[in-house]
Amino acid sequence: MYKTTRLQSVLIQYKWPLFLCLFIPCVYGADDNESWTSVSFEKKLPYSLKLEFEQELRLADQVSTFKQTFSELSLSYKVFDGLSLQIPYRYSTYKDKVKQRLSIGGSYKYSFKPLSLKYRARIQRTFEKNETPEDLIRNKCTIEYKLNKSIKPYVSGELSHSYNEDPVQLDEYRISFGLKVDIMENSSIKIFYIFKKEDLPKSDPDEIGVFGLAYSLKM
Protein backbone atom coordinates (compact mmCIF):
# COMPACT_ATOMS: atom_id res chain seq x y z
CA MET A 1 0.00 0.00 0.00
CA TYR A 2 2.83 2.36 0.93
CA LYS A 3 4.71 1.56 -2.26
CA THR A 4 1.61 2.25 -4.37
CA THR A 5 1.00 5.60 -2.67
CA ARG A 6 4.63 6.55 -3.09
CA LEU A 7 4.53 5.62 -6.79
CA GLN A 8 1.43 7.75 -7.33
CA SER A 9 3.18 10.66 -5.60
CA VAL A 10 6.20 10.33 -7.91
CA LEU A 11 3.98 10.18 -10.99
CA ILE A 12 2.06 13.28 -9.94
CA GLN A 13 5.33 15.12 -9.25
CA TYR A 14 7.01 14.31 -12.55
CA LYS A 15 4.35 13.58 -15.14
CA TRP A 16 3.69 17.22 -16.05
CA PRO A 17 7.38 18.17 -16.50
CA LEU A 18 7.71 15.09 -18.72
CA PHE A 19 4.56 16.10 -20.57
CA LEU A 20 6.00 19.57 -21.13
CA CYS A 21 9.06 17.99 -22.73
CA LEU A 22 6.82 16.37 -25.33
CA PHE A 23 5.60 19.80 -26.40
CA ILE A 24 9.02 21.47 -26.69
CA PRO A 25 9.36 20.37 -30.35
CA CYS A 26 6.01 22.06 -31.06
CA VAL A 27 7.24 25.35 -29.56
CA TYR A 28 10.44 25.43 -31.61
CA GLY A 29 8.78 24.09 -34.75
CA ALA A 30 6.06 26.76 -34.88
CA ASP A 31 6.14 29.46 -37.59
CA ASP A 32 5.09 32.07 -35.03
CA ASN A 33 4.42 32.39 -31.31
CA GLU A 34 1.54 34.38 -29.87
CA SER A 35 0.28 35.37 -26.43
CA TRP A 36 -3.38 35.43 -25.36
CA THR A 37 -4.39 37.15 -22.13
CA SER A 38 -7.97 37.49 -20.99
CA VAL A 39 -10.29 38.48 -18.18
CA SER A 40 -13.77 37.02 -17.85
CA PHE A 41 -16.76 37.52 -15.57
CA GLU A 42 -19.57 35.06 -14.94
CA LYS A 43 -23.00 35.68 -13.39
CA LYS A 44 -25.71 33.11 -12.68
CA LEU A 45 -29.24 34.17 -13.60
CA PRO A 46 -32.67 32.75 -12.76
CA TYR A 47 -34.16 29.82 -14.71
CA SER A 48 -30.82 27.96 -15.06
CA LEU A 49 -29.33 30.76 -17.19
CA LYS A 50 -25.79 32.11 -17.00
CA LEU A 51 -24.25 35.25 -18.49
CA GLU A 52 -20.53 35.50 -19.27
CA PHE A 53 -18.37 38.35 -20.54
CA GLU A 54 -14.77 37.99 -21.73
CA GLN A 55 -12.20 40.54 -22.89
CA GLU A 56 -9.05 39.22 -24.56
CA LEU A 57 -5.87 40.65 -26.08
CA ARG A 58 -3.75 38.71 -28.58
CA LEU A 59 -0.18 39.53 -29.64
CA ALA A 60 1.61 37.95 -32.62
CA ASP A 61 4.99 38.09 -34.45
CA GLN A 62 6.84 36.43 -31.57
CA VAL A 63 4.63 38.29 -29.08
CA SER A 64 5.85 41.68 -30.36
CA THR A 65 2.89 43.21 -32.24
CA PHE A 66 -0.84 43.65 -31.79
CA LYS A 67 -2.97 41.02 -33.53
CA GLN A 68 -6.48 41.51 -32.20
CA THR A 69 -8.65 42.22 -29.20
CA PHE A 70 -12.17 40.99 -28.74
CA SER A 71 -15.17 41.30 -26.44
CA GLU A 72 -17.43 38.27 -26.12
CA LEU A 73 -20.84 38.02 -24.47
CA SER A 74 -22.31 34.57 -23.96
CA LEU A 75 -25.66 33.35 -22.67
CA SER A 76 -25.91 29.71 -21.59
CA TYR A 77 -28.72 27.48 -20.37
CA LYS A 78 -28.23 24.47 -18.11
CA VAL A 79 -30.43 21.67 -19.46
CA PHE A 80 -29.43 19.28 -16.67
CA ASP A 81 -26.31 18.50 -14.68
CA GLY A 82 -23.43 18.27 -17.16
CA LEU A 83 -25.32 19.43 -20.27
CA SER A 84 -25.63 23.08 -21.31
CA LEU A 85 -26.42 25.14 -24.41
CA GLN A 86 -24.58 28.36 -25.31
CA ILE A 87 -25.05 31.36 -27.61
CA PRO A 88 -21.85 33.48 -27.74
CA TYR A 89 -21.44 36.76 -29.65
CA ARG A 90 -17.94 38.11 -30.33
CA TYR A 91 -16.80 41.53 -31.57
CA SER A 92 -13.15 41.46 -32.71
CA THR A 93 -10.95 44.42 -33.62
CA TYR A 94 -7.81 43.94 -35.75
CA LYS A 95 -5.31 46.49 -37.08
CA ASP A 96 -7.24 47.07 -40.28
CA LYS A 97 -10.60 45.35 -39.92
CA VAL A 98 -13.46 44.40 -37.63
CA LYS A 99 -15.10 40.98 -37.41
CA GLN A 100 -18.29 39.86 -35.70
CA ARG A 101 -19.04 36.26 -34.83
CA LEU A 102 -22.26 34.58 -33.73
CA SER A 103 -22.27 30.99 -32.52
CA ILE A 104 -24.63 28.39 -31.14
CA GLY A 105 -23.47 25.24 -29.43
CA GLY A 106 -23.66 22.81 -26.58
CA SER A 107 -21.37 20.99 -24.19
CA TYR A 108 -21.54 17.89 -22.04
CA LYS A 109 -19.28 17.10 -19.08
CA TYR A 110 -19.00 13.71 -17.40
CA SER A 111 -17.00 13.26 -14.20
CA PHE A 112 -15.57 10.16 -12.60
CA LYS A 113 -13.24 11.52 -9.96
CA PRO A 114 -10.50 12.54 -10.21
CA LEU A 115 -11.01 12.69 -14.01
CA SER A 116 -13.62 14.53 -16.03
CA LEU A 117 -14.35 14.46 -19.76
CA LYS A 118 -15.95 17.34 -21.65
CA TYR A 119 -17.16 17.53 -25.23
CA ARG A 120 -18.20 20.79 -26.91
CA ALA A 121 -19.73 21.28 -30.36
CA ARG A 122 -20.31 24.69 -31.91
CA ILE A 123 -21.56 26.16 -35.19
CA GLN A 124 -20.30 29.69 -35.87
CA ARG A 125 -20.68 32.35 -38.53
CA THR A 126 -18.15 35.18 -38.86
CA PHE A 127 -19.08 38.47 -40.52
CA GLU A 128 -16.67 40.98 -42.06
CA LYS A 129 -17.49 44.06 -44.13
CA ASN A 130 -17.39 43.43 -47.90
CA GLU A 131 -16.58 39.74 -47.33
CA THR A 132 -18.62 36.56 -47.62
CA PRO A 133 -19.62 35.22 -44.17
CA GLU A 134 -17.45 32.33 -43.00
CA ASP A 135 -19.20 29.31 -41.50
CA LEU A 136 -17.42 26.74 -39.34
CA ILE A 137 -18.21 23.75 -37.16
CA ARG A 138 -15.91 23.28 -34.16
CA ASN A 139 -15.55 20.14 -32.04
CA LYS A 140 -13.50 20.13 -28.85
CA CYS A 141 -12.69 17.37 -26.34
CA THR A 142 -11.08 18.05 -22.95
CA ILE A 143 -9.70 15.72 -20.27
CA GLU A 144 -9.24 17.30 -16.84
CA TYR A 145 -7.54 15.80 -13.79
CA LYS A 146 -8.32 17.07 -10.29
CA LEU A 147 -4.92 17.08 -8.62
CA ASN A 148 -6.30 18.57 -5.40
CA LYS A 149 -9.02 20.99 -4.32
CA SER A 150 -7.56 23.94 -6.22
CA ILE A 151 -5.33 22.60 -9.04
CA LYS A 152 -6.67 20.96 -12.21
CA PRO A 153 -4.32 20.17 -15.12
CA TYR A 154 -5.95 19.40 -18.46
CA VAL A 155 -5.32 18.49 -22.10
CA SER A 156 -7.62 19.16 -25.05
CA GLY A 157 -7.95 18.76 -28.80
CA GLU A 158 -10.11 20.72 -31.23
CA LEU A 159 -11.03 20.33 -34.91
CA SER A 160 -12.66 22.99 -37.12
CA HIS A 161 -14.17 22.50 -40.56
CA SER A 162 -16.59 24.21 -42.93
CA TYR A 163 -20.10 22.74 -43.10
CA ASN A 164 -21.02 24.04 -46.56
CA GLU A 165 -18.26 22.32 -48.55
CA ASP A 166 -18.44 18.92 -50.21
CA PRO A 167 -16.33 17.02 -49.44
CA VAL A 168 -15.77 18.37 -45.93
CA GLN A 169 -12.24 19.69 -45.38
CA LEU A 170 -10.56 20.38 -42.06
CA ASP A 171 -9.75 24.06 -41.63
CA GLU A 172 -7.76 24.00 -38.38
CA TYR A 173 -6.76 21.80 -35.47
CA ARG A 174 -5.55 22.68 -31.99
CA ILE A 175 -3.80 20.69 -29.28
CA SER A 176 -3.45 22.29 -25.87
CA PHE A 177 -2.56 21.64 -22.27
CA GLY A 178 -2.79 23.83 -19.22
CA LEU A 179 -3.32 24.28 -15.53
CA LYS A 180 -6.38 25.76 -13.84
CA VAL A 181 -5.80 27.10 -10.33
CA ASP A 182 -8.55 28.28 -7.98
CA ILE A 183 -7.05 31.24 -6.15
CA MET A 184 -10.18 32.17 -4.17
CA GLU A 185 -13.64 30.72 -3.71
CA ASN A 186 -15.02 32.57 -6.73
CA SER A 187 -11.98 33.25 -8.92
CA SER A 188 -9.36 31.27 -10.82
CA ILE A 189 -6.47 31.61 -13.25
CA LYS A 190 -5.62 29.37 -16.18
CA ILE A 191 -2.14 29.01 -17.65
CA PHE A 192 -2.00 27.19 -20.98
CA TYR A 193 -0.16 26.43 -24.20
CA ILE A 194 -1.81 25.79 -27.57
CA PHE A 195 -0.26 24.40 -30.72
CA LYS A 196 -2.50 25.06 -33.72
CA LYS A 197 -2.28 24.46 -37.44
CA GLU A 198 -4.32 26.90 -39.54
CA ASP A 199 -5.53 26.91 -43.16
CA LEU A 200 -5.05 23.17 -43.57
CA PRO A 201 -6.22 23.11 -47.23
CA LYS A 202 -3.14 25.19 -48.15
CA SER A 203 0.01 23.42 -49.34
CA ASP A 204 1.96 24.97 -46.44
CA PRO A 205 -0.37 25.45 -43.42
CA ASP A 206 0.61 27.92 -40.71
CA GLU A 207 1.86 26.41 -37.44
CA ILE A 208 1.40 28.68 -34.43
CA GLY A 209 2.25 28.31 -30.75
CA VAL A 210 0.21 30.21 -28.17
CA PHE A 211 1.15 31.00 -24.58
CA GLY A 212 -1.90 32.04 -22.59
CA LEU A 213 -3.04 33.41 -19.26
CA ALA A 214 -6.71 33.79 -18.31
CA TYR A 215 -8.37 35.17 -15.18
CA SER A 216 -11.98 34.30 -14.35
CA LEU A 217 -14.30 35.74 -11.69
CA LYS A 218 -17.70 34.38 -10.67
CA MET A 219 -19.96 37.16 -9.43
Predicted ranges, named:
Residues 29-86:
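Start-of-domain marker
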Residues 39-43, 73-77, 104-108, 139-145, ...:
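Residues on the lipid-exposed face of transmembrane beta-strands in outer-membrane beta-barrel proteins
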Residues 21-28:
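Hydrophobic h-region of N-terminal signal peptides that target proteins for export
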Residues 44, 107-110, 114-161:
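Detector for outer-membrane/organellar transmembrane beta-barrel domains
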Residues 55-61, 89-95, 110-112, 123-127, ...:
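Transmembrane beta-strands of outer-membrane beta-barrel pores
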Residues 33-35, 67-71, 98-102, 133-137, ...:
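Residues that define the transmembrane beta-barrel architecture of outer-membrane proteins
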Residues 155, 166-219:
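Predominantly the C-terminal beta-signal and adjacent terminal strand-loop region
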